[in-house]
Curated annotation (Swiss-Prot):
Belongs to the conotoxin T superfamily. One of its GO terms (molecular function) is toxin activity. It comes from Conus araneosus. Keywords: Disulfide bond, Secreted, Toxin. Disulfide bonds join 2-11, 3-8. This is Conotoxin ar5c.
Length: 11
């Protein structure tokens, strides 16, 4: 998964 500022979402 891709994570930015503790928010993760599918890549």
């Amino acid at each position: 998964a891709c994570c930015v500022y503790k928010i993760c979402y599918p890549c």
